[in-house]
Amino acid sequence: MIDLKLLREDPDVVRRSQLSRGEDPALVDALLTADTARRTAISTADSLRAEQKAASKSVGGASPEERPALLQRAKDLAEQVKAAEATQSETETAFTAAHMAIPNVILDGVPAGGEDDYAVLDVVGEPRALDNPKDHLELGESLGLIDMARGAKVAGSRFYFLTGQGALLQLGLLQLALRLAVDNGFIPMIPPVLVRPEVMAGTGFLGAHADEVYRLEADDLYLVGTSEVPMAGYHADEIVDLSEGPLRYAGWSSCFRREAGSYGKDTRGIIRVHQFDKVEGFVYCAPADAEAEHQRLLAWQREMLAQIEVPYRVIDVAAGDLGASAARKFDCEAWVPTQGTYRELTSTSNCTTFQARRLATRYRDANGKPQIAATLNGTLGTTRWLVSILENHQQPDGSARVPAALVGFVGTEVLEPKG
């Protein structure tokens, strides 16, 4: 949720953020109205309760002649308090809905606009000249790494098996990511992949894109699309100790996405699937440290991309393409030869205090006063990386070179065609 102090003191900042995102700025005025109504209702209910308490006390010391009128007054006030509390409850419900409807306020410098309005911050490496390159699925099948047909037979479209050295390649990649994280002070985690509704909502994933999330109705639990979700809930309703700097976690989990809004997109191969594995970095820090921590996450992602030896670029994602919780997001996109373009391999988001405010995660400032923490997240490795590894390291004889950093995990320097 956005900071109400900012909303009340400078609502135009929130309106401008809404416009940059392509969202309705009228939602800001609706929240201001709901906030005023809620505060008025609380004040009215408090005043009536105080008046009722005083009236009840006066009955005890009243003369017999005064008591009937005072009793009636106390009774009338009790009815008024009941009505005022009902109004307060209604206004609080309306306020919460209006508050939850507004996404995070973007940071200065974030490009305005939609999916295609990003800013390119850096380009690393030159794409190789390849004659008639094979795509990752053709390579994956010929090298015995990916089996989409049996994945579909077992679970339906957008499911797959990673087999043999394909499984080893992914496991090696994720172990490499986890090793990098641990070497940089992250605490490794294997979190739950099912979470309660309040945790999913707290991270901002039950808004406009709720239909992307798998839900187990009988248990009222959600399957996570990223381990960001359980790691954000890890310190819900807690005061965390940031006296020695940010808390950094690295979660390894399977991730699940319905891809409800992507019908017909990336139907071939493992670029867009319902289940994949990922190592995700997650950080709790003081808000003043969040932008510097965002740059650190990006640097660690770039270090991982250097390990797989692929050309990539870094983009500053436009406001309209940010999730509800992100105030800024950087993506690293790797070159995919058969598509002639760059595709996202990592993202890192600065969520400022948006998630922690919803999840009541605080820290103590230098004066010992509890304050809302900031949260950030960033991909350190995921299944989709195999796409770029295979396509960029393919060789004319149909084999694919294994990046040097992964050779020890896979057990070979070259993946050879099977049969």
UniProtKB/Swiss-Prot annotation:
Catalyzes the attachment of serine to tRNA(Ser). Is also able to aminoacylate tRNA(Sec) with serine, to form the misacylated tRNA L-seryl-tRNA(Sec), which will be further converted into selenocysteinyl-tRNA(Sec). GO terms for cellular component: cytoplasm. GO terms for molecular function: ATP binding; serine-tRNA ligase activity. L-serine binds at T226, S227, E228, E280, T379. Homodimer. The tRNA molecule binds across the dimer. InterPro entries: aa-tRNA-synt_IIb (IPR002314), aa-tRNA-synth_II (IPR006195), aa-tRNA-synth_II/BPL/LPL (IPR045864), Ser-tRNA-ligase_type_1 (IPR002317), Ser-tRNA-synth_1_N (IPR015866), SerRS_1_N_sf (IPR042103), tRNA-bd_arm (IPR010978). This is Serine--tRNA ligase. Residues 45-66 are annotated as: Disordered. Its EC number is 6.1.1.11. SUPFAM superfamilies: Class II aaRS and biotin synthetases, tRNA-binding arm. It is found in: Cytoplasm. NCBIfam families: serS. GO terms for biological process: selenocysteine biosynthetic process; seryl-tRNA aminoacylation. It comes from the Bacteria.
